[in-house]
Amino acid sequence: MTMESGAENQQSGDAAVTEAENQQMTVQAQPQIATLAQVSMPAAHATSSAPTVTLVQLPNGQTVQVHGVIQAAQPSVIQSPQVQTVQISTIAESEDSQESVDSVTDSQKRREILSRRPSYRKILNDLSSDAPGVPRIEEEKSEEETSAPAITTVTVPTPIYQTSSGQYIAITQGGAIQLANNGTDGVQGLQTLTMTNAAATQPGTTILQYAQTTDGQQILVPSNQVVVQAASGDVQTYQIRTAPTSTIAPGVVMASSPALPTQPAEEAARKREVRLMKNREAARECRRKKKEYVKCLENRVAVLENQNKTLIEELKALKDLYCHKSD
């Protein structure tokens, strides 16, 4: 019992000493703890972890376990402003996409406005709608509308030709030839001259056909000639030349009179004759002047030769005279 009580007294004494030392260490460490507490304030919001245990050796040689007040540095919970940067870049991309969509919409609207403008063919049709006998040009349609073939009706006017004598010749589609004098008004009072149509023949053959006048007379003429009887009773023959189908469209007939040349050809021939006549006159005058000049030169040479002979004779006479005086 005595040993047990002694041990208890010793343990109680050691405990009292330990408590006193702990109090002294606590008093000495208060400024540091306060400082550490001040330093560790920003990390108060960090996640809780187990406190670190530090072994402290006292001056009397005892070792005490002290719970560390300074906590380990925790990873910062402050997020970097990358999220905001990503947000800004996303907004910029969305604005670019919106601008591209707007540009595509504007280009589509511009194409629609251009497609609504009237084409040149439509303007030409509007201008030529009032002119009689002018075929209308169908406006180009889209591919959807061109599925069905469009048929255009073209009205071909009756060709009317005027000869150099003042007569009018109208050739209808049926093959009839109508004649009118210069005094008639328009197409009224035309004399109809019907010609029988000949069948297709080989090239190089001559076809004769009957031409019936208004008074009932029939005249046998070649197929490429037309006989015209004027009001005065004169009968004139006109030759009709048909050009090949490759150069002129079918239905176009060229009428010409071999006996009466056209006015431009006569004017050109007259000008050519005048030019040739002037050239001949100029050449004749040039030759005449050349002959006169040659004659003038020949006369001058003859005069100079005579003068030279005279001077030679005078020189001889002077020499003879000088020789006699010296003797």
From Swiss-Prot:
PTM comment, free text: Stimulated by phosphorylation. Phosphorylation of both Ser-119 and Ser-128 in the SCN regulates the activity of CREB and participates in circadian rhythm generation. Phosphorylation of Ser-119 allows CREBBP binding. In liver, phosphorylation is induced by fasting or glucagon in a circadian fashion. CREBL2 positively regulates phosphorylation at Ser-119 thereby stimulating CREB1 transcriptional activity. Phosphorylated upon calcium influx by CaMK4 and CaMK2 on Ser-119. CaMK4 is much more potent than CaMK2 in activating CREB. Phosphorylated by CaMK2 on Ser-128.
Residue(s) of cross-link: Glycyl lysine isopeptide (Lys-Gly) (interchain with G-Cter in SUMO1): 271, 290
Domain bZIP: 269-327
Domain KID: 87-146
SUPFAM superfamilies, sorted: Leucine zipper domain
Assembly and oligomerization: Interacts with PPRC1. Binds DNA as a dimer. This dimer is stabilized by magnesium ions. Interacts, through the bZIP domain, with the coactivators CRTC1/TORC1, CRTC2/TORC2 and CRTC3/TORC3. When phosphorylated on Ser-119, binds CREBBP. Interacts with CREBL2; regulates CREB1 phosphorylation, stability and transcriptional activity. Interacts (phosphorylated form) with TOX3. Interacts with ARRB1. Binds to HIPK2. Interacts with SGK1. Interacts with TSSK4; this interaction facilitates phosphorylation on Ser-119. Forms a complex with KMT2A and CREBBP. (Microbial infection) Interacts with hepatitis B virus/HBV protein X.
Disease: Angiomatoid fibrous histiocytoma: A distinct variant of malignant fibrous histiocytoma that typically occurs in children and adolescents and is manifest by nodular subcutaneous growth. Characteristic microscopic features include lobulated sheets of histiocyte-like cells intimately associated with areas of hemorrhage and cystic pseudovascular spaces, as well as a striking cuffing of inflammatory cells, mimicking a lymph node metastasis.
Name of the protein: Cyclic AMP-responsive element-binding protein 1
Source organism per UniProt: Homo sapiens
